[in-house]
Amino acid sequence: EEIIKIHNRDSVLDGPTGEINTLSYSEKGHFLCISPWNFPVAILIGQISAALACGNRVTVKPSEHTSILGYLVTKKFHEHGVPISALELILGDGTYGDALSNIESIKGVAFTGSLNTAKKIQSNLIINHKEIVTLIAETGGVNVMMADSSALLEQATDDIIRSAFDSSGQRCSALRVLCIQDDIYDDLLTMLKGSMR
């Protein structure tokens, strides 16, 4: 109900030069959500919920490695009142995601996965659509951790190992760069080597 109120209400905003501006919300239309294998429920639910909350029709394409979870998540949305016409599920490998991003009715894509795949989707959207299509892509990060002389070495060691190696390092929040103050470098490196054995 709150979403409907937001969508049906225009807000008048004062402009910096005295003009009047109107802010209104409207759906994009048909949104494609492509989710990864490593957080198959959390990311998929977030993508679907956001797209539906904004009033969009949603096509879901989970990773081919998490098809059953994608099916179960979509089924739960349907069981709780989301019409099949508003949320559809497509199962298959990456060629399906590639084909779906070429469909002209797609007005937005939420994608979590590799940079190369995001670039392919972006290229499809640019080449095959007459208008600009929204692309929300989460493709990874270069995450940095700094350890200085105030660090508790045991805690830092645990945090570094978990951040770098949980999920085999295959997540966007994984540690990629570690900066260590000279004063603790040798001790921390020794502890890290010991933990990795």
Where is each model-derived feature located?
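N-terminal Rossmann NAD(P)-binding subdomain characteristic of aldehyde/semialdehyde dehydrogenases
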Residues: E1-L44, I48, V82, L87
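A structured beta-alpha segment of the ubiquitous adenosine-cofactor-binding alpha/beta core
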Residues: I20-N21, E88-A110
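Generic beta-strand/beta-sheet core signal
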Residues: I34, L44, C54-S63, I90-G92, ...
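Short amphipathic alpha-helical segments
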Residues: I45-G46, Y71-L72, S101-N102, K120-N124, ...
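PLP-dependent aminotransferase-like
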Residues: G46-G97
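ALDH superfamily catalytic-core signature
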Residues: K76-P83, G108, N116-R197
